[in-house]
Amino acid sequence: MTINIKTDSPIITTGSQLDAITTETVGQSGEVKKTEDTRHEAQAIKSSEASLSRSQVPELIKPSQGINVALLSKSQGDLNGTLSILLLLLELARKAREMGLQQRDIENKATISAQKEQVAEMVSGAKLMIAMAVVSGIMAATSTVASAFSIAKEVKIVKQEQILNSNIAGRDQLIDTKMQQMSNAGDKAVSREDIGRIWKPEQVADQNKLALLDKEFRMTDSKANAFNAATQPLGQMANSAIQVHQGYSQAEVKEKEVNASIAANEKQKAEEAMNYNDNFMKDVLRLIEQYVSSHTHAMKAAFGVV
């Protein structure tokens, strides 16, 4: 399109479809001077680029149904409500996981405590066995010492009896020798009692001592037997008491072992609950992501946004 403009000064006029510019100048004598048409190259380039860009942009499909603002507000409210519920479920799962962590820590401590108590009871049982061995050793040593004293005393008594018996036998032999001598001399009127009257006090004294020693020997032997008879039940009672305590200790060990097993089982349950809560949290997050994505696609489709 070409526009001719008459004016006192040069005027340039453009339009949406202007492809040339004509300049006319009116002089003082009224003569119109026409200049050559000049083509607007920049405008032509811009117009070609605009037409090219319009040809590359796809045309959007116009929705066949208009947007209902009320339904849009309701949809937004439903989205917010659903997201609130899902977020609440996520928070509950997180709290449950925290409780599971605390429960697992508690069960770990309970397991460790039960194992420590079990070890302590086993150590106590070992100490009781050592105590039983010590008591048995003490009783055996006491009995041995008492027997040794008794034997030493009896040996001493036996030696004294041997000396006394030797003295008595020696005097009897002297009496017999004296009797033989007097019989050989023809003096048969002297009796054995008359000859033995000289050593009779020593004989009687030695015989009395011998009787006392024999009595003392029997008493010493009886005391040793009585002491052994008394110490053996005491040792047996001590061993029985230790065995009873050892039985209690073994029962405590079994109980602690059961408690440790229960604590380990509870720990496993807590770990399983934690795994379940983790999976539940992942599922909730996946649902939130899917729900938001679906709602976003729906809104884009409603507004015609690609």
Curated annotation (Swiss-Prot):
Membrane-related topology note: Single-pass membrane protein
How does gene deletion manifest? Mutant displays reduced virulence in a mouse model system.
- Which superkingdom heads the taxonomic lineage of this protein's source? Bacteria
Membrane-spanning parts: 128-152
Tell me, what's a Pfam family for it?
Answer: YopD
What job does the chain carry out? Component of the type III secretion system (T3SS), also called injectisome, which is used to inject bacterial effector proteins into eukaryotic host cells. YopB/SctE and YopD/SctB are inserted into the host membrane where they form a pore and allow the translocation of effector proteins into the cytosol of target cells.
Its name, as the record gives it, is: Type 3 secretion system translocon protein SctB
Source organism (scientific name): Yersinia enterocolitica
Q: Which gene encodes it?
A: sctB
